[in-house]
């Protein structure tokens, strides 16, 4: 299949990588797994056994007329432990490499199908100035965009750093969440070839 390139001839690309069907279930699974892997999972609360004190019972079992109490750190009491206390846990989900690659192929194919993939021969800025990058993007009518190149250009990265709706990634650093989070994905021809090499 062919991909149109801005201000250049169309390029021939793999049907497998850029022309497959959209597998929504698989993409959802990949996105959930990716986001779950980013969770810190370090929250911790104290149960009645973790809270300091509460070893001696506050009053005797019988004869006071009050309700029975065995510890001042009971979850019912103020200053007591938490009933179902949170514990540190690993939230990461297993996703096979084969499934992950298939999800990326599915996302790329959907980007092509919905005209959200903008292919350019090359994309760079001469100096690390946000104003210069913004001018280039405005000329292409791009406001909410992910820029993907084979390797991240330092000037481009610095110029985009202060723009809330622009992100710069290399092919290796592209993930399912970033690829679907933006209105458009601006990608260089060399990055397209790299994707074919990795996902083909």
From Swiss-Prot:
- One MF term from GO for this chain? structural constituent of ribosome
**Coiled-coil regions, chain positions:** none
Note the InterPro entries from the entry.
Answer: Ribosomal_uL4, Ribosomal_uL4-like, Ribosomal_uL4_dom_sf
Q: Record keywords: DNA-binding included?
A: no
Q: Which Pfam families match?
A: Ribosomal_L4 (PF00573)
Q: Which UniProt keywords apply?
A: Ribonucleoprotein, Ribosomal protein, RNA-binding, rRNA-binding
Annotated GO CC locations: ribonucleoprotein complex; ribosome
Which residue intervals are annotated with compositional bias (Basic residues) in the record? Answer: 54-65
One GO BP annotation is: translation
Region Disordered, residue ranges:
38-68
| Keyword Ribonucleoprotein tagged | yes
Could you describe the subunit structure of this protein? Part of the 50S ribosomal subunit.
General function of this protein: One of the primary rRNA binding proteins, this protein initially binds near the 5'-end of the 23S rRNA. It is important during the early stages of 50S assembly. It makes multiple contacts with different domains of the 23S rRNA in the assembled 50S subunit and ribosome.
Report the family membership.
Belongs to the universal ribosomal protein uL4 family.
Q: Which HAMAP family match?
A: Ribosomal_uL4_B
Q: What is the protein name for this chain?
A: Large ribosomal subunit protein uL4
Q: What is the lineage of its organism?
A: Bacteria, Pseudomonadati, Pseudomonadota, Gammaproteobacteria, Pseudomonadales
């Amino acid at each position: 299949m062919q991909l149109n390139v801005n201000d250049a001839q169309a390029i021939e690309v793999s049907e497998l990588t850029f022309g497959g069907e959209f597998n929504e279930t698989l993409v959802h699974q990949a996105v959930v797994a990716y986001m779950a892997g980013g969770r810190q999972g370090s929250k911790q609360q104290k149960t009645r056994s973790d809270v300091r004190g509460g070893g001696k019972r506050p009053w005797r079992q019988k004869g006071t007329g009050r309700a029975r109490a065995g510890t001042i750190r009971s979850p019912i009491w103020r200053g007591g432990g938490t009933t179902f206390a949170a514990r540190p846990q690993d939230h990461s989900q297993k996703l096979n490499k084969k499934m992950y690659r298939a999800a990326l192929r599915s996302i790329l194919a959907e980007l092509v199908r919905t005209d959200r993939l903008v292919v350019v021969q090359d994309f760079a800025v001469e100096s690390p100035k946000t104003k210069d990058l913004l001018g280039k993007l405005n000329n292409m009518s791009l406001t909410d965009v992910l820029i993907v190149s084979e390797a991240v250009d330092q000037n481009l990265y610095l110029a985009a750093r202060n723009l809330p709706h622009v992100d710069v990634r290399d092919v290796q650093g592209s993930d399912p969440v970033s690829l679907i989070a933006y209105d458009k994905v601006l990608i260089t021809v060399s990055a397209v070839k790299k994707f074919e090499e990795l996902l083909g």
